[in-house]
């Protein structure tokens, strides 16, 4: 489980005022010096991430944040980063200094409630204060208490963590019965990592194998030959979005087909909203602004999918003079209302809550959002075909195009 991608781990955000003992608590539960601790207020400046296995919960990633109530020059910037963490947190761990529960703690609790996030209270320095009984009492500097604290944390998490967070939904296991034949088309292009497959392909392969399916992986130029060599037609074909038009042209009409991006739109976000958002492409007009959001911060190549290919395809398909902005990493603009469309990447490195948060932010200001692969399928004129395995989403897409 140590190799579980961060995007599939339960995200636990440690929040609290400065010097409440968040970093000391992190060091205690992980059994390592994962974060620097000091008596000086504001020691933690950026978000510190630490992965851990918490059986029977499973793989988690702790997010240690800068404390609230920092009056230094950089305090506001640290606060902004801390609040951004809430967009990707599955659970908030509120660390209090003893029984102190003032405006800072109330603000964290209010923000967690507004986002419908479970909140667990941890009262640190319990040896110095008379702490309430509605949380976990700890002395974060007492290393001998680690086992007892872990037991309490796991018990608290089991009570509040949604079942779908612990039991990650399937990528494609519900689309075909076990022992089906699945063909995956995986181009090896300039953006492919050397000597390995990209994460979405690896996860889809593992998911198919978990459901006892037979998987054939080919490059796009070998797909037609693979179909001829198979004794029976495949039950499902999944391809990289960049070759979706070729795949659709070569796939018999009776065979289900889709893309890795569509599978991830369903796993990580809201496929219904993403399909609805794709219908907005045909309604773009001259001068409209489009935001293209990349979740990771890879080095863009000359033919980059987000910075070059999709912008070019959008302009070619619509025939419009579009203004296109790009953002990458954790950054997501606050002024989304100026955009006519947001195109989000597949989010393979993000957890589901963060992608849902972005969808929700767009929905609040009435801006349609889709993802790279769904956008590409629409631009290639084959989205209806690759949405066909998903009846409800296909119906919403067709309705939105009217």
Residue ranges: model-predicted function:
Residues 50-58, 63, 73-143, 170-174, ...:
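Conserved C-terminal guanine-recognition region of P-loop GTPase G domains, centered on the G4
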Residues 1-76, 80, 84-87, 91:
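Conserved G1/Walker A P-loop phosphate-binding module
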């Amino acid at each position: 489980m140590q190799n579980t991608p961060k995007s599939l781990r339960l995200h636990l955000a440690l929040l609290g005022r400065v010097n409440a003992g968040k970093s000391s608590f992190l060091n205690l539960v992980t059994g390592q010096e994962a974060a620097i601790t000091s008596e000086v207020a504001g020691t933690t400046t950026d978000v510190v991430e630490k992965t851990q296995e918490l059986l029977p919960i499973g793989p988690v990633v702790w997010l240690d944040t800068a404390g609230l109530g920092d009056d230094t020059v950089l305090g506001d910037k640290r606060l902004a980063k801390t609040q951004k963490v809430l967009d990707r947190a599955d659970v908030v761990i509120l660390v209090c200094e003893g029984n102190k529960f003032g405006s800072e703690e109330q603000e964290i609790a209010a923000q967690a409630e507004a986002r419908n996030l479970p909140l667990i209270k941890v009262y640190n320095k319990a040896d110095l204060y008379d702490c309430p009984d509605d949380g976990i009492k700890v002395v974060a500097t007492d290393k001998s208490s680690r086992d007892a604290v872990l037991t309490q944390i796991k018990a608290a998490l089991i009570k509040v963590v949604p079942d779908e967070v612990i039991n990650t939904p399937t990528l494609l296991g519900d689309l075909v019965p076990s022992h089906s034949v699945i063909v995956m088309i995986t181009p090896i292009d300039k953006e492919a990592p050397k000597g390995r497959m990209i994460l979405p392909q690896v996860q889809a392969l593992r998911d198919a194998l978990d459901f006892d399916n037979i998987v054939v992986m080919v490059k796009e130029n070998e797909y037609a030959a693979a179909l001829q060599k198979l004794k029976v037609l495949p039950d499902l074909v999944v391809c990289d979005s960049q070759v979706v038009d070729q795949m659709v042209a070569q796939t018999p009409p009776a065979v289900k087909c889709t893309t890795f991006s569509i599978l991830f739109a369903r796993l990580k976000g809201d496929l219904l909203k993403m399909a609805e958002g794709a219908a907005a492409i045909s309604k773009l007009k001259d001068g409209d602004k489009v935001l293209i959001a990349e979740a990771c911060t890879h080095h863009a190549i000359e033919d980059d999918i987000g910075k070059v290919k999709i912008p070019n395809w959008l302009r070619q398909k619509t025939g419009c003079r579009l203004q296109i902005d790009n953002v990458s990493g954790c950054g997501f603009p606050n002024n989304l209302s100026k955009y006519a469309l947001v195109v989000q990447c597949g989010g393979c490195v993000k957890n589901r809550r963060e992608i849902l948060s972005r969808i929700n932010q767009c929905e609040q200001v009435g801006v349609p959002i889709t993802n790279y692969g769904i956008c590409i399928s629409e631009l290639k004129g084959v989205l209806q075909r690759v949405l066909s395995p998903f009846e409800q989403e296909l119906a919403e897409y067709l309705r939105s195009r009217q």
